[in-house]
Design a protein with these regions (language model features):
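Mixed-charge, low-complexity intrinsically disordered segments
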Residues: 69-75, 81, 150-178, 206-209
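Catalytic micro-motifs at enzyme active sites that drive phosphoryl/nucleotidyl and oxygen chemistry
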Residues: 40, 128-132, 167-175
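Sec-dependent bacterial lipoprotein signal peptides
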Residues: 1-26
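Short loop/turn motifs at secondary-structure junctions
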Residues: 14, 47, 137-140
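N-terminal segment of the mature soluble domain
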Residues: 54-147, 327-330, 339-349
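Short, compositionally biased leader-like segments
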Residues: 139, 151, 271-274
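C-terminal/domain-edge helix-coil "capping" segments
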Residues: 26-48, 175-182, 186-295, 299-352
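Short linear interaction motifs
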Residues: 33-35, 121-126, 163-167
């Protein structure tokens, strides 16, 4: 089965892949992965000490909205709505629990469902927000305000015009099954009665299979399973928006140059970074600018691994001053961005 799905793309904090591949092919560097903490897009104010989760989406089987009630009977809408909302919040909780900011134990979603037909309502009034936060004994709420989700199946006839054998005609169909929807989330500050964040997004997940009409269509997911996967990923994506997360990024260090650079490379490969750094520091003052530049570059990585970003920038800049390589300039830019991100992280979570 061939699945073509929407893929969430996160900007990589890594060295340009083409440059890295070129260096690796020459066996002059060794690639490693390090884990970095990426700040959330949304900063929860530090006066917020507790958060509750609220579902304010309208109930589609009660809303009398033709776009909902035309396609499926109320009992089917009830089942799908239950699945979708459960998975929205399960994805959200899993994302938040994967971060260092939240520690949710048996989180509860409080239901404040609406019976109107407004998919995406106006923000809560100060009075209504105060009522909810007081009722839940919380400083803030993360609320699913509304959603619209639909699915569709398209069949494409891709039959082969060639007779493969006498009396045999090859038939092939392409089946595109799509779940598409729009979700609206808001984060409310119950202490000051204001909005912290408002986020509305439209996303699509697609499954594609090929084959004869009966065989291929059975390879597509069941409707409820497709909705489960779609809703879970959308909730997870929103959770990643509001909480810092760990990310694996690619880095490299030089392993060729002179005896000390090679020996330090072996130390680093075996996890003896302190010993490697000692040799690199010796070579950072080498009269050979190429050796000194490599040693300084490696010391920049050593410093970054220890989360010492200012020394890392200093070492990378020193390397670039010696030899103006494009990859070094790129690395300096990455480190500068990480330095700014660290300042943002200090406003989001306590860092030691």
């Amino acid at each position: 089965m061939n699945h073509n799905k929407s893929i969430r793309r996160i900007g990589a904090c890594g060295i340009n892949a083409i440059i890295l591949l070129s260096l690796l092919s020459c066996n002059t560097v060794r690639e490693i992965s390090i884990e970095v903490l990426v700040p959330a897009e949304v900063t929860i104010p530090e006066h917020i000490q507790s958060v509750a989760f609220v579902n304010r989406s309208y109930t589609p089987w009660l809303a009398r909205n033709p776009k909902d009630t035309m396609a499926r009977p109320p009992e089917d809408l009830y089942i799908l709505d239950t699945i979708i909302n459960n998975k929205f919040f399960l994805g959200l909780f899993d994302a938040l629990n994967s971060s260092p900011l939240f520690n949710l134990e048996d989180p509860i979603t409080f239901q404040f469902r609406r019976s109107d037909s407004s998919r995406f309502p106006d923000p809560l009034s100060v009075e209504n927000l105060q009522y909810i936060t007081d009722s839940l004994y919380t400083d803030a709420i993360i609320s699913l305000e509304g959603y619209r989700v639909s699915d569709s199946l398209t069949v494409w006839d891709q039959s082969n015009d060639i007779w493969l054998e006498p009396d045999y005609y090859f038939i092939e169909y392409k089946f595109d099954y799509i779940v598409e929807g729009t979700m609206q989330w808001r984060i409310y500050d119950g202490i000051y009665g204001i909005l912290i964040d408002e986020f509305i997004t439209t996303d699509t997940t697609e499954w594609t299979v090929y084959g004869d009409s009966e065989g291929a269509i059975n390879e597509l997911p069941e409707v409820v399973d497709a909705y489960r996967e779609y809703a879970y990923q959308r909730g997870f994506d929103f959770g990643m928006r509001v909480s810092p997360s760990w990310s694996q990024v690619r880095r490299f260090y030089f392993i060729t140059g002179n005896k000390n650079i090679r020996k330090a490379g072996e130390f680093a490969y075996n996890g003896k970074w302190e010993e490697a750094a000692g040799l690199w520091k010796q070579e950072a003052g080498s009269a050979d600018p190429e050796i000194a530049a490599k040693a300084a570059f490696n010391l920049a990585l050593y410093s970054e691994k220890k989360d010492l970003l200012i020394p890392a920038i200093d070492w990378a800049t020193r390397s670039y001053d010696l030899i103006q390589e494009k990859y070094t300039k790129t690395y300096i830019e990455i480190l500068e961005k990480r330095k700014l991100n660290k300042l943002k992280l200090e406003r989001q979570i306590p860092l030691k």
